[in-house]
Amino acid sequence: LDQACRALSPDLSRLPRQHLDIAVPTPPCPDAPHSSEEIPLTEYRSENPFGVRSDGTEPFSAQAGATSSPPRATGTLESGLLLEAFDAQLFREQSETVVAKLEKHLADLSIRGLDLTDPAILTDAARALMTTEREQVAAFDESKLAAIVDLYIKTGIQVHSPGYMGRQFSGVVPLSGVIDFVSSVVNQPSSFYEAAQLPNVAERIMAEELNAFIGWDPGSFAMVTTSGGSLANLTALLSARNHAFPGYWSEGALSLTGQLRPAIAVGDDVHYSVARAAGVMGIGDAQIVRLPLNERHQICVERARPVLDAAERQGLNVFCLVASAGTTPVGAFDPLDELAGLARERGLWLHVDGAHGASLLVSDELRHKLRGIEKVDSLTWDAHKMMFTPAPCTLLFYRNKEKSLGAFRQQASYVFDEEPDIYTALDSGEKNFECTKRPMIMPLWTLWAIHGRALFAQKIEYLCRLTGDVHRILEGEPDFETLHRPEANILCFRYRPAGLPEADVHDFQVEIRNRIKFEGNFFISKVNVDEVAALRVVMMNHQVTTEHFRMLLGEIRRVGQDLLRRTRRIS
C-alpha cells in the first residue's frame, strides 16, 4: 500500500515552478459541453498530477460507477439581506464612506491627545448603534456605519496629531493601512504557504533584506513573524531552553532531576514580557537573575559577572541572557558586543529584545547603537513601532535556522508535512505558536517594495534628532530636570518648580500626567526612573516639532502651578 501510494503521488519538487500571471483568465462558459467519461485514477494521476483535466474540469470521483457530477445543494438562502451583506457593490459603497472619513482624519493636524470617555458612557453609545433585530438579518444602515467609524476615531489616541508624544506605537504610513485593509478582506492566514502564497514569499524577502543589516550568514539564519514582541520573546526563550535542556519538551521538569534549576539573566529595565514568558515556561521569579545597570541604564558587564557567579552558587543554571536594544523606560541600548563576549564565555544563549530599537539598524547614521548584533543568537524586532506599520507586526530572527525549530517539537499531520517540498519549505507553522496568523508582513513589505529603506531611515533619524533637540531645550529650563541623555527617541524628565517638597516629587509628576491626559490636548506617558515617577515622551510622529514640545512644557507648567496653588490652599 505504501508503494502504491508513493507511485500515485507526484514528486512536487520536480514540478516546474509556477509563474504568477496577473491577468485573470476568462472562465469557461457554463454551457460548454462536459464529458461524463471518467479517467481511471492511475491514468488521471499520471497524466496530470495537479488533478485538473485539460479542459479545466475536475472529475468528481474516481470510483467505479460513481456519478459524473457532484451533488447539488438542496438548501436555499431565504434572506436576500444575507446575500447583500456580501455584495461587492455594497462593499465599494461602504469602503468609500470609511475612506472619506479616514482621509479627513489624516488631514487634521490640530493639536489633540486623547478624548478620555467614561467606559459606561461609551458602552451606552456603542449599544445604541446596535440593531435590535434578533431573528432576521438587519438591512445595512450607512448612517450607523458612519457613526461607528466616527466613534472609533474620536475615542482613540490621536497618533497622527502633533499632540501625540506618549507611546511606542505610531501613526502608520497610510499605504500600510491600505494593504492591511486588503489583508482583512482576502483573509489569507499566513502560517502555511498554500494558504497565503505572497505573504510567505514577502516574509522570506523581508528576512533577507533586514538580515543584510544584522549581518548573519545569508544561508544560515531564519526569521518568523509573530503577533507582538511578547510572543516573540516567549518563543525565543523556549528555543533557548530546549537547546540548553533537550529533554525538557518531552519529559518536562522531570528531565532536570539532580541538576541546577534553569534560570535566565536580564537587565533590571527589561520589558515585563520577559518575566512573564519565564513564568509561562515554569521559571519562577526567583530564577530570574537581575543584572545591575550603569548610569546610562545599560547592563553593566563588569558588575554582571559576580552576580552570575552568585546565581550559580545558589543552585541556578543560567542558560539565557536577555539584553535590550531600546528599553521601554528610557530607550537605553545594552552593550551588545560586550554582552556577546560574556555570553560566549559562559555558554549562554544571548537574546536581544529589540522590539523598539532594532529598527535603527536600517539607518546608516544610527546603526552603531546595535554594535555587536551579529553575535547574538536571537532578536525580537517590532515593525509596528519604528517601522510605522499596523500592529501587530513582530519579526523574530535566529542566527541559526536549525535552532528556530527548537521552540516546538510536535507532529500534526493535518498541517505539518513530513516530507517538505519547495512550497512547504516556506511554512512557518512549526516555528511559532500561531496556526491562524495574520499576514502581518504585507504592509511592511509593500512599503519597502514601493518606497525602499530610505522612507524608514529618514523618519527614524528625524525622530531621534528631534529627541536630542528637546533634551537640549530641557537642559536650558531651570525648573525641569532631565534624567538621561536620549539614545534614540525616548526621553524622561521631571517638572520641579521652586518650593516643591522632595517628598512630593513622585505624586506631583503622576498628577501632572493625569491632568494633561484628561485635558486632551497632549498625550504623554509616565514611568518610574530610580523608583520615582517621571514624565516620558516618545517621539513617534514626524509632524511634531520643537515648537510643539515648547507648547507642551507650557501646559506642564500651567498644570503644575495650578496644582501647587491648590495644595497650598488645602494645607
What are the language-model segments listed below?
Residues 50, 529-571:
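PLP-dependent enzyme catalytic core of the Aspartate aminotransferase-like
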Residues 2, 11, 19-21, 34, ...:
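Intrinsic-disorder-associated, low-complexity terminal segments enriched in Asp/Asn/His/Tyr and depleted
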Residues 482-516:
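Conserved PLP-binding catalytic core of the aspartate aminotransferase-like
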